Amino acid sequence: VFMIFLPQPSSLSYGEGTFTIHYDSRIFLDSESPAELFSAAQLLQQEIETQTGFRPAICRRHQPVGSHLIYLTASPELSREAYTLAVTPENITICGSLKSGVLYGVQTLRQMIRQAGAVLPTVLISDKPAMENRGFYHDATRGRVPTLSYLKQLADTLSFYKINQLQLY
């Protein structure tokens, strides 16, 4: 299985087997994880429901229980905006440097779900940005002025591609 990722991760290796998202799948947050990770979990939950029809529950506990978990965790040891994404036949683990790293790991998993649906190939991805500032410059002075809802949608799209700055002129 060959998948396209934008931007291309720093390290990518495929394994044997697949992980299947189904009705028993859950998104798991450690009870000590920062509250900001919940928004990344909600984003992933919405993507899974849109693409597969399954709506995994979001759980917070000290210890994960069961298989078919999508485990989101923050690790301050990773460099800024870095993450690892491990898809095994049993579980998916995203470990990121606080909120931004976990969010970028979720965005990579969203790209996988859009290409493969509910049956994901096993993969190990380790990624960190090649450039600290990745921006989009939008000249809003010519033509129609963008609405707030359009700018929010644009920010979401830029986040999907791991662009971390939006500049309006």
Language-model features: where?
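The substrate-binding groove and active-site-proximal loops of carbohydrate-active enzymes
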Residues: 95-96, 134-148
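Contiguous, structured surface segment used for ligand recognition
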Residues: 2-134
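Catalytic domains of carbohydrate-active enzymes, especially glycoside hydrolases
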Residues: 150-169
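Mid-sequence acidic-hydrophobic segments that form the walls
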Residues: 109-116, 139, 157, 161
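Short, solvent-exposed loop/turn and secondary-structure capping segments
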Residues: 105, 148-149
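Core alpha/beta catalytic barrel or barrel-like domain that forms the active/cofactor pocket
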Residues: 124, 136-138, 165-169
